[in-house]
């Protein structure tokens, strides 16, 4: 993901 806390995207 685009941001560390949304890695799954």
Swiss-Prot record:
<comment type="function">
    <text>Putative defense peptide.</text>
</comment>
<dbReference type="GO" id="GO:0005576">
    <property type="term" value="C:extracellular region"/>
</dbReference>
<comment type="similarity">
    <text>Belongs to the frog skin active peptide (FSAP) family. Tryptophillin subfamily.</text>
</comment>
<keyword id="KW-0878">Amphibian defense peptide</keyword>
<protein>
    <recommendedName>
        <fullName>Tryptophyllin-2</fullName>
    </recommendedName>
</protein>
<dbReference type="GO" id="GO:0006952">
    <property type="term" value="P:defense response"/>
</dbReference>
<keyword id="KW-0964">Secreted</keyword>
């Amino acid at each position: 993901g685009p941001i560390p806390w949304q890695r799954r995207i």
